[in-house]
Regions:
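Phosphate-binding loop/pocket of nucleotide- and phosphate-handling active sites
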Residues: 170, 216-242
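Active-site-proximal loop->helix
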Residues: 13, 20-77, 154-172, 241
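Short internal alpha-helix immediately C-terminal to a glycine-rich phosphate-binding loop
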Residues: 1-10, 21, 102-113, 217-220
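A short, small-residue-rich loop immediately preceding and capping a beta-strand
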Residues: 6-41, 113-126, 210, 231-235
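Alpha-helix C-terminal capping segments
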Residues: 1-5, 22-34, 53, 131-138, ...
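Active-site/ligand-binding-proximal alpha/beta "capping" segment
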Residues: 84-122, 129-133, 178, 190-205
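Active-site/ligand-binding loops adjacent to catalytic centers
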Residues: 71-72, 82, 135-209, 224
Length: 242
């Protein structure tokens, strides 16, 4: 709305079910913009209920139609309501925020003493923005991308259903910059959910399954590369398990 692209009270439409959807629902509620979130019907019921409680209207698409099906639902919602489609998978404001805010915060908080940064990939905005900034200041830092084992689009592998909301869209997002990613680690949904629960019980951190996937990937990285003793995990979202 600051750029004049969103009118007062205009409906906002987005194809998302992850941590961005949560943040967007809160922002729309506070700014009095109706929100329609389009997502596959396979998104956990708990996640759908949580987003509904935050004020979003949920529109579901059959999973077999993939991302195209979700985007079709989003465009139908735009045409029906006159809404504004953010399209954060291709919107450069997404990685730009992380270049300006998240990346600098990480470098400052750690004094640049990092071997690797582990980031889950949904829209690709976080890993791109954080990665580009971090590598500009810390040329030796390794950027590790995390995706679901069941949906390995980033690795060029099979894509299918998984239970890690916010990760693994089933395609390579426009916002994803593969040139700053040093390695990709795939984590099974069951391991991601189990690790998120473990983090809650042991450290009282209510991480989402995507956060569990990131932590699991970091463990694997530090096992495979014991010389990496300073690894930072970017954990997004809150507890909503399958």
């Amino acid at each position: 709305s600051e750029r004049g692209e969103l009118s007062p009270g205009q409906t906002v439409v987005e194809a998302s079910s992850g941590s961005f959807a949560v943040a967007l629902a809160i922002a729309c509620s506070r700014s009095h913009h109706p929100l329609i979130l389009c997502m596959p019907a396979t998104v956990p019921t708990e996640r759908q209920k949580y987003l509904s409680q935050l004020g979003a209207k949920i529109v579901l698409s059959n999973y077999v139609y993939g991302r195209k099906g979700v985007e079709k639902r989003a465009m139908e919602a735009v045409n029906k309501t006159g809404g504004y489609y953010l399209n954060y998978f291709a919107n450069d404001l997404n990685p730009e925020f992380h270049r300006r805010v998240t990346g600098p915060a990480i470098v400052r908080a750690t004094d640049g003493q990092l071997d690797a940064i582990v980031v889950g990939v949904g829209s690709g905005g976080t890993v791109t923005g954080v990665g580009e900034y971090a590598k500009a200041w810390l040329p030796d830092v390794k950027i590790i991308a995390v995706e679901p084992y069941e949906s390995q689009a980033l690795s060029g592998g099979y894509t299918g259903h998984h239970n890690i909301p916010g990760l693994g869209a089933g395609f390579v997002p426009e916002n994803y910059n593969p040139y700053i990613v040093d390695s990709i680690i795939a984590v099974p949904s069951s391991h991601a959910n189990a690790t998120a629960r473990e983090l809650l019980y042991t450290d009282a951190i209510p991480a989402s399954p995507s956060g569990g996937a990131v932590l699991m990937a970091a463990r694997q990285l530090m096992t495979d590369r014991p010389e990496f003793s300073r690894v930072l995990c970017v954990i997004a979202g809150k507890t909503v398990y399958e």
